[in-house]
Amino acid sequence: MRNKICDELNNTDIGKLVNLCGWVDRRRDHGGVIFIDLRDHSGFLQITINPDDGANLFKQAETLRNETVIMVSGIINERPKDSINKNLSTGKLELKVKDLQILNQIKNNLPFPVSIHDYENTKEELRLKYRYLDLRRGKLLKNLKTRHKIIKVAREFLDNFGFTEVETPLLTKSTPEGARDFLIPSRLSNGEFFALPQSPQLFKQLLMVGGLDKYYQIAKCFRDEDLRADRQPEFTQLDIEMSFISEEEIISFNESLIKKIWKEVLNINFDNAFPRMKWQAAMDNYGTDRPDTRYQMLLKDLGEVLGDIGFNIFTKAIKSGGSIKSITVKGGNSSISNVRIKPGGDIFQVAQDAGAGGLAFIRVKGDELETIGAIKNNLSEEHISDILRITEAEDGDLILLGAGDKQIVNQSLDRVRQYIAKDLNLIDTSKWNFLWVTDFPLFERNEEENRYEALHHPFCSPKNIKSKDSENLKKAIENSIANAYDLVLNGLELGGGSLRIHEANLQREVLKTVGLTDKEIDEKFGFLIEALEMGAPPHGGIAFGLDRITMLIIGADSIRETIAFPKNQQAKCLLTNAPSNVSESQLKELDIEITIDE
């Protein structure tokens, strides 16, 4: 049907007869001549139709509506100098139409303009419902091509290092991995269920037991969890696992992979090794294990200085084992008003939404500190000196403070730090600040349920566990650091991994520590324990979020912009109206009865 696409055309095609297919992006009538912007997947070309070219041809062109699918034949000409479009690669060319065929006419008015000129004015819910029209605009297609290139570069890199791509099952066993499973009822095994995998974690470990040595997969994963801008119920991981490998070797190899992707896709080189930070340092200084290091405002611990000044909130925080921390906003006296950091203000609300009761503040004015009386009246000169030294605050700076539970203080000041950095334009968006975060705790304590939870997952190996004595092993595990590592970019986790447990008794003990009984371990993970007893090699790996990598590379705000057919934030597909009801006969086949609470 066609012998060229728009973006292929150049000056060497002038005078040639070409056939093009595409959509009418816009039609304009000027001085008796019809100008049409023809759009295909590659770009645009202006085509012209003159009454002198034939009455029927001109009349047909007059009926064309935007998004009509057409095929045109004609001669490529050079545009007049006064009509050159410097914004297009084909902006110096136009097609003088000799023949026009309508391949498909649109039936009704479109729900939104497809033309790139109206791109920003369409609500996302409408874009998701008519995703095929949104794709046609070109921006999303470009995103998908970038995603394809990222995958292609990763595959070539891993292939060159002897990795084997293996597909692991999508219908598998429900195992506790943190989030809720999507369950699939089995028709043949009445009353039993498959689960869609939250990750290929256990299967890739079993591949190592099977001697594969080096594995990767572009893996679909599923988690039934609450959504946000960088989450989807189904998502894609670049999943990697290796045998006989150390933590240092995994970090070094995967750093090379990421550098290769950025080089090939963005033509950006990173000559130096990515910096590393231990988990505890990240929590102490940033309040999060995903720190954005493009700007300052580090958290500072003021517990020793302010814990005994007599201010009830501070005293209570320290006595209950909590903390008092601060961030310093340089020049904050002039850029942030009291209204914004008091109840009802936007910054106060950010802290409250993160779980904090509120924010205290200190304004530095020369040698004086301005704050509420309950704090100021109890500050000695030594207190003031210590505050200024620890916070590194100077005249004109604003100090914001949080007090209470350590986790909530960290979380709320982290959110406030991010919010203020965006609000005051403190972030250098041209920077790519990669960071390896290492030495995570193996567990975190869930005080409400009085039990331990794995910080990553219960298959991470603990560091420096030497004793195999059961009682000593239990104590050592509870206080252990994990052989785990995350790669963070500009405050977002790109990927995470660990060395895995490859000894059966150690794996059983770790699963017991997170609250499973021997019976539950055998029911849920018996196949893994059995495999580890049969000569499992030391192994480890990592999984990168492909959607998130693509989002950062293309500069989007949501991973929905990187996925062809994403769900909305209620986990619904607006295009197909899924999830949806199924017939009674389908439910009967599965022996499922649905009860709806009134």
UniProtKB/Swiss-Prot annotation:
Q: Where in the cell is it found?
A: Cytoplasm
CDD domains (UniProt xref): AspRS_core (cd00777), EcAspRS_like_N (cd04317)
GO biological process, alphabetically ordered: aspartyl-tRNA aminoacylation
Task: Kindly report the protein's main subcellular placement as a broad class.
Answer: cytoplasm
The UniProt entry, under PROSITE patterns, shows:
AA_TRNA_LIGASE_II (PS50862)
Q: Does the keyword Amino-acid biosynthesis apply?
A: no
Q: What is this protein called?
A: Aspartate--tRNA(Asp/Asn) ligase
Q: What is the species of this protein?
A: Prochlorococcus marinus (strain MIT 9312)
